[in-house]
């Protein structure tokens, strides 16, 4: 499982021009599910995202997490994170989990993250074409990955 995590001052997702989720200060998490992922990887990634110390403390040092700041998270599914561009010019998505499994693990990730944060987490919609807007803060962007064989 991979989470592309971006510290944002605001982020929002729309489907067909209608807003479906938005946050202010927090993390935008683009989530990709690998074909070998299980609930173990999902739970690990959710906890890691909740505990990532990427927000500045009183001294300006990146040392606080969403749990410390009370910030929000917005989670958007993105199977293209598993796009393989090593051969040719058209990405292959064979490493991405099939949609039914990916959707279940995506929902599991969201529930786990909500449990850690103690609040509802707005999300994009699995399988939908979405417009995502964000204002990076920093910018701070991290690649958080956990493979089933680790």
Swiss-Prot record:
It catalyses: glycyl-tRNA(Ala) + H2O = tRNA(Ala) + glycine + H(+); a D-aminoacyl-tRNA + H2O = a tRNA + a D-alpha-amino acid + H(+). Keywords: Cytoplasm, Hydrolase, RNA-binding, tRNA-binding. It holds the Pfam family Tyr_Deacylase. GO terms for cellular component: cytoplasm. A motif (Gly-cisPro motif, important for rejection of L-amino acids) lies at residues 138-139. It is found in: Cytoplasm. Homodimer. PANTHER family: D-AMINOACYL-TRNA DEACYLASE 1, D-TYROSYL-TRNA TYR DEACYLASE. Belongs to the DTD family. An aminoacyl-tRNA editing enzyme that deacylates mischarged D-aminoacyl-tRNAs. Also deacylates mischarged glycyl-tRNA(Ala), protecting cells against glycine mischarging by AlaRS. Acts via tRNA-based rather than protein-based catalysis; rejects L-amino acids rather than detecting D-amino acids in the active site. By recycling D-aminoacyl-tRNA to D-amino acids and free tRNA molecules, this enzyme counteracts the toxicity associated with the formation of D-aminoacyl-tRNA entities in vivo and helps enforce protein L-homochirality. This is D-aminoacyl-tRNA deacylase. The gene is dtd.
